Structures are given as structure tokens and as C-alpha cells.
Amino acid sequence: MTDPVALTADLIRCPSVTPEEGGALSLLEARLSAAGFACTRVDRNGIANLFARWGEKGHARSFGFNGHTDVVPVGARADWRFDPFGAQVEGDWMYGRGAVDMKSAVAAFAAAAMDFVADTPPDGAVILAITGDEEGDAKDGTVALLDWMAAQGEAMDVCLVGEPTCPDEMGEMMKIGRRGSMTFFFEALGVQGHSAYPHRAKNPLPALAKLVDRLAGLELDTGTDHFDPSTLAVTTFDTGNPANNVIPAACRATVNIRFNDAHSSESLTAMVRGIAAEVAAETGIEITDRVSVSGESFITPPGRLSDLVAAAVETETGRVPVLSTSGGTSDARFVQHHCPVVEFGLVGKSMHQVDERVAIAQIPQLKAIYTRILRDYFA
């Protein structure tokens, strides 16, 4: 039997701060290859990715797991109680960067997959698509894996992403979709001048302030069947002006929108640009924008896959998971173009924090859930 706790510790000891591979995928490749998985490194533009398959290529019954081994920076090491790459155990907890997000889940589904195919070889395929580019730009990670799979005729019937999904208690929540995310980068252009002679300048600040105030006051919607209301947040407002007696020539603001399935990035872009044009006309200030879309909203409708995962979670934890679309973006937004996808993982309270830590008992419990999902899927 593969010990997922020991494998978690081994992965934490790999300093895989995005975009560095840090030895994590090489470690997994060696373990999975020894267990009979056909492994392929799908690196792109310096980003490391690993594809592993047990069973027949292109089989109609192919269950996939997706996850990442890259982690966010640790910040100031002096603030940590233990080495962030030491996998130190204290009491019931294992400490380290990536302990929750998400090396424990990668260890759990890798261990579950290896033991499952050894104990009860299924009529089908088990696929692991693991990236080193989820916490970074996410352009050459899961996207690269999916591009490669399509070109090679590799396919998943369904996929489970092992992101931490439970707010407080193991088993309380799974994700069946995610909100979309997009960011507007605005710049208002005026004419610099002395603050004592404002008539000789053209101050862009009031115009941009008017725009972000108008946007911040919008009610985008009241929610949909599976989503909470969309949100809009003003996240930056900058002039880069250190002088208090100079009217700046330009100022910038950033606005982030998390949107549900009542909208698309295209419809929101049109709406926001329309409001910006109105403000520009009212103030006589030119306002430009650049838009970055991290992903559209999506949902895997409740049904076969969510029922499969929920039943396994309830059996192993005694809890019926809530079907949620809350939170930020994940690589499920890419997988959903390939096959139905849901997310289930550990309690995520300490992810990205100093002293990130995982409750050790949850790791074998998660392996048991993933094993049961595989068993029931191939039954």
C-alpha cells in the first residue's frame, strides 16, 4: 500500500515555488512509472507538466485526476515556525508550503490510483494530469496538458480536480463550477499642471474616481440557480505622483469582476466600456482600458459525476457535501472544455498562509475517498 502521508512529505520537501519544478514532478514520475503508469513529460515554455496513464489509450471509461505541484512563494522565512520545505510534523499537523494547496491531494490521488490499479485492475484507464503552472500564469500548465492530450488522442471521460474545497470540515463541500474572473486596467489621461493653476491643467483624477464609483455601485445581478450574485471590486487606484502640488497627467485604476453564468466576459466588457465612454464624455477626459480574462463561468450540472463523488464523500466522512460554485478560479476552468469536471479536496483554511499546514488524518481519509470514487466509477 502506498502511504499518502509519506508521499505528501516527500512532495513538500521539493521546493517547487512556481514556476520551478523543484523535483516534485520528477518524483511523481518515478513513483508512477514504477507502478505501471505510462508517463510523459509535457513541458512547454520552460514549465514542467506530467501526464500519466494506466490502461488503454482513448478508452471510453477513463477517469482523470488533475492537480498541481507548484506552490506560491513562502514570504519571509523568519515568520515560519518551521522550514517551509521541511514537512515538519507537530502533533496532528504537517507543516510546509503546499501542504494544503495542494501536494496532499496530489499525493492522495496518486496513492489511490497506484493502489487501485494494482489491487483491482479496471477495464478502462486512470489518468493523472499534473502541472507545475497553476499558481503562476497558468498558460503552459493544464492548458498545455490538454492541448497535448487532444493532439495525441488522449481523453478523459470525467475528471476530478483535487483543490482544497472544504471551508471548515472534511467532506462538507465540493465544487461543481466556478465563477468567471476578469480584470479591467483603466488609465485616465489629462494634462499635468501646477495645483495652484488648475485651469491650466486637465486633472484626470475626478474622472477616474467618477468611473470607479459608478462601477462600484452597480448591482450586476441577484444570483442564479447555482451561483451567488456576481461581484465587482475596485482593487487599485494609483497616480504615481509623489508631489502634492502637481496635478498628474494620468492615473490608473484596476477593477476585478467575479461573474456568474448570467454574464460572459464579452457582455461585461461591453457594459463596462459603455459606462467608461459615458464618463469620458461627461468629463472630457480620455479613458482607456485593457481587459484580462482569467476564465468564463462554468458549471457541471448535478448528475452522474457529482453523485459519484458525493456518495464516496458521504461514505468516508458521514457528511453530504454541498454542491458549490464559490471561491476563486482553478484549473477546472480549462478542464471543463475537455470533459465534465468537479473538484474535491481537503480543508483549505491555511492555504497560501505562513505556517501552512494539513491535518495529517485527512490525507489517508482523502485517499480513501478517491479510492472509493475509482472503485464505484469502474464498478
Curated annotation (Swiss-Prot):
Q: What is its EC number?
A: 3.5.1.18
Q: What class of enzyme is it?
A: hydrolase
Output one GO MF annotation.
cobalt ion binding
UniProt-listed SUPFAM superfamilies: Bacterial exopeptidase dimerisation domain (SSF55031), Zn-dependent exopeptidases (SSF53187)
Q: Where does Zn(2+) 1 bind?
A: 68, 101, 163
What does the entry list as the binding residues for Zn(2+) 2?
101, 135, 352
Look up the record and name the pathway of this protein.
Amino-acid biosynthesis; L-lysine biosynthesis via DAP pathway; LL-2,6-diaminopimelate from (S)-tetrahydrodipicolinate (succinylase route): step 3/3
**Which Pfam families does this UniProt record tie to the protein?**
M20_dimer, Peptidase_M20
Q: Which cofactor does it need?
A: Zn(2+); Co(2+)
Task: Enumerate the transmembrane spans.
Answer: none
Reaction(s) catalysed by this chain's protein: N-succinyl-(2S,6S)-2,6-diaminopimelate + H2O = (2S,6S)-2,6-diaminopimelate + succinate
Which GO terms of type biological process are on file?
diaminopimelate biosynthetic process; L-arginine biosynthetic process; lysine biosynthetic process via diaminopimelate
Q: Which domain of life is it from?
A: Bacteria
The entry's free-text remark on the cofactor is: Binds 2 Zn(2+) or Co(2+) ions per subunit.
Can you tell me which residues form the catalytic site? 70, 134 (proton acceptor)
Q: Which UniProt keywords apply?
A: Amino-acid biosynthesis, Cobalt, Diaminopimelate biosynthesis, Hydrolase, Lysine biosynthesis, Metal-binding, Zinc
Its quaternary organisation is:
Homodimer.
Q: What does this protein do?
A: Catalyzes the hydrolysis of N-succinyl-L,L-diaminopimelic acid (SDAP), forming succinate and LL-2,6-diaminopimelate (DAP), an intermediate involved in the bacterial biosynthesis of lysine and meso-diaminopimelic acid, an essential component of bacterial cell walls.
Known NCBIfam families for this protein?
dapE_proteo, PRK13009.1
The entry's family comment says: Belongs to the peptidase M20A family. DapE subfamily.
Name of this protein? Succinyl-diaminopimelate desuccinylase
What is the species listed in this Swiss-Prot or TrEMBL entry?
Dinoroseobacter shibae (strain DSM 16493 / NCIMB 14021 / DFL 12)
